[in-house]
Amino acid sequence: MIRIDSIWLATEPMDMRAGTETALARVIAVFGAAQPHCAYLFANRRATRMKVLVHDGFGIWLAARRLNQGKFHWPGIRQGSEVELDTEQLQALVLGLPWQRAGSGGSITLL
């Protein structure tokens, strides 16, 4: 099991051809460092694909996700901007649901 204590989403798109080293360099450029037990999420320009980089304290994990239909609800592109997500928001995001409306405990936080 990979321990994840915090989840960060980058608003600027990333080329999905990026491998582990390129994705790690992008995390460092956007977030300043790859902190242990943190997940960093990136999407392509069309928000149809997503990559997640996790530093588990010993090494780096890189996972990719693509939806069969639709696209991810990604925030607008803002230079150097990042957003912290909770577990419920991440679960909604990876399913292609509007994660901005999901709050902890299933509460609705935005109409």
Task: Tell what function each PLM region has.
Residues 1-111:
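Polybasic/polar functional segments that serve as interface/processing modules
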